[in-house]
Regions:
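A structural signal for short, well-ordered beta-strand segments and their strand-loop junctions
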Residues: 8-11, 70-71, 88, 126-129, ...
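Conserved RecA-like ASCE ATPase "motif II neighborhood" in helicase/translocase motors
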Residues: 51-113
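Alpha-helical scaffold elements adjacent to nucleotide-binding pockets in ATP/GTP-utilizing enzyme cores
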Residues: 19-27, 83, 106, 110-113, ...
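ASCE P-loop NTPase helicase motor core
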Residues: 101-159
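ATPase catalytic-site recognition across NTP-hydrolyzing enzymes
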Residues: 159-217
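Conserved nucleotide-state-sensing and coupling region of NTP-binding domains
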Residues: 9-75
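Walker A/P-loop NTP-binding motif
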Residues: 1-2
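Flexible loop/turn segments at secondary-structure boundaries
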Residues: 16-17, 96, 133-137, 159, ...
Length: 217
C-alpha cells in the first residue's frame, strides 16, 4: 500500500531475520504480483539492493538510506544510523537466550537499544514470537504495557486441536515433553526448576481437621 515505507525485521540473530527477508524476496519476484503492481515492483530484480544481505528496495519516489525491507539482528548486527517506519520483531527470544538471567537481560537491553532505530515520528512496532521463560523479554514488555498480547495456541477453549489432528497433537506432546510443549504450543513457559500445580495434588476435605492437628508455619 505504501512503497515509501521502510521496514526493519529484527530477530535474535541476523541470520534468522535474513531468512524472513528471503521469503519476502521470493514473494515479490512472483510474476503475478508484478502484473498487479507494476508501478511498485520490478519486472526483473535489480542487481543492487535486492538480496537478504543488502535489503530489498521497490520502486519509490523518495531516496531514504534505508531499504524498503532490511534484515537486522537484535543482539548482533543492529544497524547503525538507520530509522524505520515499521520495526518487526520476530523471534527475538530463543530457547538459548533464556538459559540464564544474564542472557535474558542481554536480549531485553538489546531491544531497548533498537528503539532508537525508529523514525522521528516514532514509527510502529510489531512483535511475534514464542515464549520460553516466564521472565523473558516478552514478559517484561507485557508488564510495562509496551505491547498488547494476542496469544494464539494450538487448542481451542475446549481443548480441541486447531492445528492438526488430535491424535497427532497428542503424539507431538508426548515426544516434546510437557515443558517444551507448553512453551512451543501453548505459549505457557515454565522456568527451569519451577513446578506447576497439578489437579491430582489437591485433596477435597468435607470437614476441617481440629486445629491442634494442623501444622502451622
Amino acid at each position: 500500500k505504501n512503497p515509501e515505507i521502510t521496514i526493519g525485521i529484527f530477530s535474535h540473530v541476523l541470520s534468522t531475520s535474513k531468512k524472513f527477508v528471503r521469503q519476502i524476496q521470493r514473494a515479490l519476484e512472483d510474476r503475478r504480483l508484478y502484473e498487479l503492481f507494476p508501478d511498485v515492483l520490478h519486472e526483473k530484480p535489480p542487481q543492487r539492493f535486492w538480496s537478504a544481505d543488502a535489503g530489498l528496495i521497490v520502486k519509490r519516489k523518495g531516496n531514504p538510506k534505508e531499504p524498503t525491507v532490511q534484515a537486522a539482528g537484535l543482539v548482533d548486527g543492529q544497524p547503525i544510523g538507520a530509522h524505520y517506519d515499521l520495526r518487526v520483531y520476530d523471534d527475538i527470544v530463543t530457547q538459548e537466550s533464556t538459559s540464564t538471567p544474564e542472557q535474558i537481560e542481554k536480549t531485553t537491553s538489546a531491544r531497548k537499544l533498537s528503539l532508537a532505530l525508529a523514525t522521528a515520528a516514532g514509527g510502529r512496532a510489531w512483535y511475534a514470537g514464542t515464549r520460553y521463560h516466564p521472565m523473558d523479554t516478552y514478559q517484561t514488555l507485557i508488564d510495562r504495557k509496551a505491547l498488547k498480547p494476542r496469544v494464539r495456541i494450538c487448542m481451542d477453549k475446549d481443548g480441541q486441536s486447531v492445528l492438526m489432528a488430535d491424535d497427532k497433537l497428542k503424539k507431538l506432546r508426548t515426544e516434546m515433553g510437557e515443558r517444551t510443549f507448553a512453551a512451543q504450543m501453548l505459549q505457557q513457559p515454565v522456568g527451569e526448576g519451577m513446578r506447576t500445580f497439578q489437579d491430582d495434588w489437591f485433596q477435597t476435605l468435607e470437614k476441617l481437621p481440629a486445629p491442634e492437628k494442623l501444622n502451622r508455619y
